[in-house]
Amino acid sequence: MSQLNDISLVAQVVVFRNTKAFDQLVKKYQSPVRRFFLNLTCGDNDLSDDLAQDTFIKAYTNLASFKNLSNFSTWLYRIAYNVFYDYLRSRKETADLDTREVDTHWNTSQDDVGQQMDVYQALATLKEMERTCITLFYMEDQSIEKIADITGCPAGTVKSHLSRAKEKMAIYLKQNGYDGNN
């Protein structure tokens, strides 16, 4: 039913230029897209907000190209994925991303902040594609097939990235005091 509603909203925007319909799509997907960027940027709130805004601008301007060959969410994540990698290419920060300082401004308890910081630091040890796959699979609950569509990689490659990323994160977290029961 959700996909049908998304298609209806897309049609209203494309055919009637109904901006309120697009506002509904933004409200529905704003948090997941922002969370996706927060994980890819290892907690950089400002950058995540900027990238999310760019994603929705591109989605709006290209909405007529949505052909319903995949879910709207898959199409939107593909745009978000491209926005992020365009940003990396334009800023030539690919090498610097691994050393990015993690943003410490959180509205949660101290224990939650510490755990979130550790997760972001563990994510920072991953290659960009590994980080993308982990974020989409575990944090955005996307299937292997949808991740393959979003990234343009074969499903087997996505599985390999997930496996390597889990292994690297487990090593990092164990070295930093996590024993699997935390």
Predicted regions and their residues:
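Amphipathic, Lys/Arg- and hydrophobic-enriched alpha-helical face
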Residues: 26-45, 62, 123, 168, ...
